[in-house]
Amino acid sequence: TEQVILIKKTDADNYTSAEDFSGVDVGAQNASLQMNLLTSQLPDANPITIGDLGVGVLELQNGSIEALAVAKGNAEMILDSNPDLMICPWEFEVAAEYEANIILITKGETALLNVVNEALAKAYADGLYGTWYEDAVALAKSENAAEVSVED
């Protein structure tokens, strides 16, 4: 999936390249793909660990951080209820091994793993995965957008 950086719209001209993040406080969730990308692709930025995206949005809006690294799907949900923010034109480069979602299954649960793999193979073959993803994003926007808004 695409990984992006959220910034304030008022800072749009300040962040157009990786170099623009030198010395900048950029938030990302601890032990996340975004934190890994942040530290590897923006080595001169100051990585700031955030507990969750709602806190990260608040920190971005109040100036505690200047940017927030998130998955693009999350960014789109955040933007729905925070019109003062935008996606930075510069995006992370994501290696192929990080582009897929994962499912965690307890080690040794071979029967469950086989059922899950069969269901996923059928979903991909039938072209359902893309529509499921779009439906999930729409549902998440409707139920979770308010959680990351400071409009309350």
Predicted regions, residues:
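Short secondary-structure boundary segments
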Residues: K9, N30, K72-G73, K107
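A ligand-binding cleft/hinge motif common to bilobed small-molecule-binding domains
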Residues: L37-S40, Q61, E66-E97, A136
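Hydrophobic residues within well-ordered alpha-helices
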Residues: F21, L60-Q61, V116
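Periplasmic-binding protein-like
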Residues: T1-K9, D80-L120, L139-D152
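Ligand-binding clefts/hinges and TM-proximal coupling segments of bilobed small-molecule sensing domains
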Residues: L33-I50, I87-E91, N117-D152
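Short helix-initiation/N-cap motifs at beta->coil->alpha
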Residues: D13-N14, N30, I48-N62
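Flexible hinge/capping segments at coil-to-helix
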Residues: I7-V26
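Alpha-helix capping/helix-boundary segments
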Residues: L33-Q34, V55-G56, N74-A75
